[in-house]
Amino acid sequence: MDKIFSHGGFSQRLPSASALGKIFSAMPLGDPLYQMLELKLAIYVDFPCEMKPGLLVTCADDIELYSIAEDEIVRFNKPGFTALAHPSPLSIGTTHGVFVLDSHKKSTNSEMETISCLRFLHKPSIDKMRNCGAVLKRQSGCFSLSDPEFVYTDSTYYVDFNTAKSLLNVLKELGTLDCEIDAYGDFLQALGPKATMDYTNNTANVTTKERGLVEVRQKIFHLLHETPLNVILLNNSKFYHIGTTSEYLFHLTEDVALRSELGLMSSAFSGHMNKPSERAFGSCVMYSVLDSSCSVGSGSVVEYCRLGAGVTIGEGSLISSCWVRLGLSVPGRVFMHSLCVNHLGQTGFVTVVFGISDNLKHSVKASANLEGLKLFGLCLAECLSHWETENEVLRFSGDPSSCSLWNACLFPVCTDQQSSFLMSLEMLQAAMQGSTFTLPKETKLISMQESLQFKNLEEMLAFRMGLYNDITQRNLNS
């Protein structure tokens, strides 16, 4: 049996996970700190012994917790695909996969039931869920959901060995792929007796519209459309999605249910003061070294950071992989993340900064339409004016016809990590306070997209190793 953990793609909604992938996102558990990978393996520890040879595919940005009766076992032993399904509100279904079940075969209200699936819908509208028969009425019993109506949404699925071999043969036939295939949308939508080919031409949920995608989807459909899709209904289960900055902050700082169910900590594998008054209730600090005079606001997460004396972090912010000089104050509701890059033959550092609610995926067709892009809740053109930068000078990396915060070259490359953080913070403060900040001459600006292309993972991991050594030494001395 093989396991496939999707690393999380571009992680445009949680950019702190972009460099390494969401599967390596920090979780406030353990000593040393657990990552999502370890948590997933712990949750699935009982699966392998009840699984025939095949593949198990799971996402890197969700947590599934479930309860079943002592005499029930989750088994992956049927031909074709077998997917786990969780009762969810209709609103959750619009951003996930939804199963259309054969309601005539659903006979019990037990905690677990295996049933055949007629069709899989990928991020459908509520109207489509209703029209396709995916919406069900809640009945009394073991359901953990209180909504009167619900749908079954996806999480993890299994592919038996023979089906996996067939997919491998298709890959060999296609040769080198020139397009990105979605392990959920492009495979599961082909399954079930009521599946149609309509989805193969729908590119609404595709990050980059690449040539050949429709043809590849159609080949996959013709291969899989008669393959069975079995669904294991986990009626007493909870599905937590943590793939956005807002979700990450909420579940790690405010979600009382998840914190109690998993035993999440407010401070995990960190070297700092033990005075509770210095760290607001509902904050989360992971794998970081903080001076005893630091203050972290409620609802904020600090991970893989060094914070100097007197540093204050506002409420509801996410600060990741940063080295913050003494005395600096970070506003609330902002995202700041430092990366090491190899740029123009030299090692440098970039700190990207966005508002927590900024939409990095939203794009406009030309750089002349900057009023359509919002940074820190402000029009991007207004931010540029505070940095004494002309709209026409702003460069966008990658596809020139798609201009977004993701590929806007806004962030200065600096020689060291502390200077990088300071300069980006000064740009943020100028925009939010309506003041002016002038970039030093010859400063090179790159985008978040380019930061990933130029990333120097060795240096980024070396920074974490330095934190590890300091934290371990402090814990030994305490």
PLM region spans:
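Residue-level recognition of the N-termini of beta-strands and the immediately preceding loop/turn
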Residues: 1-3, 52-55, 229
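Short conserved micro-motifs on helix faces and helix-strand junctions that flank
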Residues: 5-7, 58, 157, 241
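Conserved core of the sugar-phosphate nucleotidyltransferase
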Residues: 18-19, 25-176, 233, 464
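Left-handed beta-helix
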Residues: 80-81, 88-91, 138-143, 147-478
